[in-house]
């Protein structure tokens, strides 16, 4: 079969689905299907009447922009068709069955891609469609390369009945088998409803496009029918809802082009598979002292500050790539580089809810820690945590079990793990945030660190309650006892005496200490008990 590229006269009018491939008898055969980046509105190609056996197949933009040097993806299964003749499907046999699958390179690294095409039967998933996706996942597993899914589907193809559900299950099973073995990314380029949402949910990272992507198990019409609640698709499952309320999506972008660029950037921090190290960049050692870190933490322990300024002062310039930016903002997670090497950053954010741990912050942190541990990415923890968020809402919704997820994730992680305590480290939250006792390799503290069971005021009210009750001036007595407790514990030295902290360091020397410590831990090897 000869494959010819269509040269478009008006690329500005081409849709995001507007990459066209003509199968016919003209021109020399090509060894691959070249995917060309196109954008914007629909464009149709007029076919000559005398061309034999011509099929027009629109490939979505999604798989296009990933390849190196403008070269796209080498397509597999381009001639696959569905095998159903029920409910008019016999008249809708389109080559590829609504999904493009293939492989290519990004920054010289092998990747596998599947890209659903909503213009073909609504991107609906059925037997042949699912078989193409499962094949590309199997190949990604065999060759140890990342998998990228570009989702744009209305759900199951109901004309094919139960085989559509079987196809979903085949994909889900492979997503689970690949979890922690190869990195998996899901880019939502359009609607994703019903069973279609569960494959992205099983992958490592989900990306959405504002005003274009939608994810929901049941759509607005079903919600209205069952619950009589009126809600728009955007309100129910748009990028904003999932980035701020549910936490389903890890990244949101204004358009598909910026999403593709974000995906490339994310790939630069992660390895090909669980047996490889993450990619590093050349780095020339120099003066690693960072004076900018000296004055970030306020003298008043109750005054907030932005932990992102601390992160920026420690890691290589402009390398911090935040994950889940708008969800559970009291916890910061993301990738960065330290002396050219990829690291995962987990940090409390004192500027939001004082940096407390709550349900969402705990699950957000735990998921990120487990990803980094699966793919050999060292962990840097920056700690300023006053405890867990109190209240009936938290208790009734499972702060105990959800808080334990972060504890579990750190405890089972075998990658190099270093903690820097910048200020507060109180109570159970101190234990959870990669403490020495749950396997942290190195723990540093700034002179401003306070490592204690609780804050000075609360501790004084409990320990000295009889003295305070008996005092004529209760407020003055409380202040006196609060100062007494603070003098004893509002510093890092008592913990250092016990060996819970390896060194008390000045803020400006943090970067230098971390570079040397992570270098020392490069060959760390831990074998956990077999399960």
State each model region's role:
Residues 1-71:
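Intrinsically disordered, low-complexity segments enriched in glycine and mixed charged residues
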Residues 52, 67-531:
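Ligand-binding clefts of soluble mixed alpha/beta catalytic domains
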């Amino acid at each position: 079969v000869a494959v010819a590229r269509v040269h478009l006269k008006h690329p500005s009018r081409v849709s995001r689905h507007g990459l066209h491939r003509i199968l016919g008898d003209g021109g020399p055969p090509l060894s691959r299907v070249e995917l060309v980046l196109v954008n914007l509105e629909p464009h149709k190609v007029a076919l000559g009447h005398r061309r034999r056996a011509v099929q027009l197949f629109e490939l979505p933009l999604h798989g296009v922009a990933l390849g190196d040097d403008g070269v796209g993806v080498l397509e597999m299964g381009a001639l696959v068709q569905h095998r159903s003749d029920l409910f008019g499907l016999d008249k809708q046999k389109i080559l590829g069955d609504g999904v493009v699958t293939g492989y290519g390179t990004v920054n010289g690294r092998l990747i596998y891609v599947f890209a659903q095409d909503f213009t073909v039967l609504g991107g609906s998933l059925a037997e042949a469609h699912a078989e193409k996706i499962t094949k590309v996942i199997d190949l990604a597993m065999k060759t140890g390369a990342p998998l990228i899914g570009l989702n744009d589907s209305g759900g199951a193809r109901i004309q094919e009945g139960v085989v559509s559900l079987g196809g979903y299950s085949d994909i889900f099973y492979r997503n689970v088998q690949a979890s922690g073995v190869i990195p998996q990314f899901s880019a939502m380029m359009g609607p994703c409803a019903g069973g279609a949402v569960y494959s992205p949910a099983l992958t490592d990272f989900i990306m959405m496009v504002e005003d274009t992507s939608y994810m929901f198990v049941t759509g607005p019409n079903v919600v209205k029918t069952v619950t009589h609640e009126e809600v728009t698709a955007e309100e129910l499952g748009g990028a904003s809802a999932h980035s701020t309320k549910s936490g389903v999506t890890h990244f949101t972008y204004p358009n598909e082009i910026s999403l593709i660029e974000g995906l490339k950037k994310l790939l630069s921090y992660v390895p090909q598979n669980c047996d490889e190290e993450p990619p590093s960049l050349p780095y020339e050692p120099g003066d690693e002292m960072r004076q900018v870190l000296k004055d970030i933490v306020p003298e008043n322990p109750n005054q907030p500050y932005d932990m992102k300024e601390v992160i920026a002062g420690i890691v290589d310039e402009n390398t911090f790539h935040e994950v889940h930016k708008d969800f559970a903002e009291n916890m910061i997670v993301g990738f960065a580089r330290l002396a050219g090497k990829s690291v995962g950053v987990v940090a409390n954010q004192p500027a939001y809810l004082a940096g407390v741990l709550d349900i969402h912050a705990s699950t957000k942190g735990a998921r990120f820690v487990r990803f980094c541990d699966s793919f050999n990415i060292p962990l840097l923890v920056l700690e300023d945590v006053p405890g867990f968020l109190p209240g009936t809402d938290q208790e009734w919704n499972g702060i105990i079990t959800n808080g334990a997820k972060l504890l579990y994730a750190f405890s089972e992680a075998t990658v190099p793990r270093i903690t820097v305590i910048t200020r507060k480290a109180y109570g159970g939250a101190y234990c959870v945030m990669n403490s020495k006792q749950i396997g942290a390799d190195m723990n540093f503290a700034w002179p401003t660190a306070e490592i204690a069971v609780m804050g000075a005021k609360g501790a004084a009210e409990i320990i000295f309650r009889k003295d305070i009750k008996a005092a004529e001036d209760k407020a003055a007595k409380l202040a006196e006892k609060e100062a007494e407790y603070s003098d004893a514990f509002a510093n890092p030295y008592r913990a250092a005496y016990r060996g819970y902290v390896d060194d008390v360091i000045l803020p400006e020397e943090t970067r230098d200490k971390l570079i040397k410590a992570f270098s020392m831990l490069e060959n760390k090897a831990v074998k956990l008990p077999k399960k």
